[in-house]
């Protein structure tokens, strides 16, 4: 039997941005970053009210099709609770469709909010599962739920009838590692960027990426001097260069200077993981080319306050 949540119940969620792939770890590696969206949700007597401020405020829907609302309802259904109405206020700082996990953060915020409204009946693993289901892969969502860096994976049932299972394990990132994002002023479609990938790759390229993904994990956790080697990739970035030429140019430029730069998610953001500051002349040049420079820390997990 479902239970109604009392009118006036409120939660505030702060969810970090994320960067996926980290070079070789396609649909597997993710890292949470100190750039946050905030979602405030209150149970009302009836209806749905959605307010949006900040990034995407002019484009995002203000009805039940908003991803945060869909994710809230998904969590409430999983918790077997109901609400009479909702007021949802989104304050977005994560750039939309730039490869910083904006959609995953919205899904995580919604699921975390729904779980908070219900009194936190869902486990961390269930929050990862529900959030990742909106994405179809867990790298971004798991990073935003769990914080730090994650190794994630998807198990597809052999019967073809059950839903995929999304899992993740947290990595404690070495305290010296920072992140700097160079964010272009244009969007990238995840679907369009995925379409350029080949259906088959060579055994040599597959082996190369397996080894570099392992190096990446070692670099993140214990050997940050290996970050450059651990962000090399042959699986997806070379194929995406033609559709993201500005990104590819900056990734190559930075890597040629010894920086561990890579395409963040589906782009177009360029991410650099580093232990020493990036040369200011490079950052100034990026700004002159209309790239937004974000100097970030590794973030902790999504936070939820109920009251």
Swiss-Prot record:
Example GO molecular function: ATP binding
HAMAP family: Homoser_kinase
Catalytic activity: L-homoserine + ATP = O-phospho-L-homoserine + ADP + H(+)
Phylogenetic classification of the source organism: Bacteria, Bacillati, Actinomycetota, Actinomycetes, Mycobacteriales
Record keywords, A-Z: Amino-acid biosynthesis, ATP-binding, Cytoplasm, Kinase, Nucleotide-binding, Threonine biosynthesis, Transferase
Keyword ATP-binding: yes
Pfam families membership: GHMP_kinases_C, GHMP_kinases_N
SUPFAM superfamilies, sorted: GHMP Kinase, C-terminal domain (SSF55060), Ribosomal protein S5 domain 2-like (SSF54211)
Binding site for ATP: 95-105
Alphabetical list of InterPro entries matching this protein: GHMP_kinase_C_dom, GHMP_kinase_C_sf, GHMP_kinase_N_dom, GHMP_knse_ATP-bd_CS, Homoserine_kinase, Ribosomal_Su5_D2-typ_SF, Ribsml_uS5_D2-typ_fold_subgr
Family recorded in the similarity comment: Belongs to the GHMP kinase family. Homoserine kinase subfamily.
Signal sequence range: none
One GO CC term on file: cytoplasm
Compartments reported by the entry: Cytoplasm
GO terms for biological process, alphabetical: threonine biosynthetic process
Protein's name according to its UniProt entry: Homoserine kinase
The protein's Enzyme Commission number: 2.7.1.39
Purpose: Catalyzes the ATP-dependent phosphorylation of L-homoserine to L-homoserine phosphate.
Gene that encodes the chain: thrB
Domain of life: Bacteria
Chief location of this protein within or outside the cell: cytoplasm
Pathway participation: Amino-acid biosynthesis; L-threonine biosynthesis; L-threonine from L-aspartate: step 4/5
